[in-house]
Amino acid sequence: MDLGLQDKHAIVTGGSRGIGKAIARELAREGADVAIVARNKADLEATARELAAETNRRIVPLAADVTSKEQVDRMVAEAAQQLGGLHILVNSGSAPGGSATATGPIETVIDEDLLQDFNVKYVGALRCSRAVIPFMKTEGWGRIINISGGTPATPAISAAAPAMPAWCT
């Protein structure tokens, strides 16, 4: 399949494993160079080596925590510099291991856990999107893809993830 991604430059948050890793792999198979982002540097480096060997594309591992504006801004600037620009952002990051902090019956959920889940999934995606838009405007082309999903056993993350599309039109 040709998605017209040859020589495009992408960032995939949550790119060291799971859905993010699978998306990074497919973007690279379509000809994009990809910066994969997650918190764990060792996992990122192993995934980058694996995907680069599979796809013969440039895979750049960048450790960053999307709950930190400073880390997001640094990561996006570094990705743009190493890749030579930015065209695509895939927001697929979530809490470590894809789990949510705030779980269980509502009466047991504490605000700090709920806010942490929102800070990772929703506000983290917003931070990344805000940071990449100037680079996409410079390129004259860009796409932002938000990955969300419903997980009935983790109500906080289920509430946070659907909030993402509300600000994307």
Predicted regions and their residues:
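Conserved glycine-rich cofactor-binding loop
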Residues: H9, S16-G18
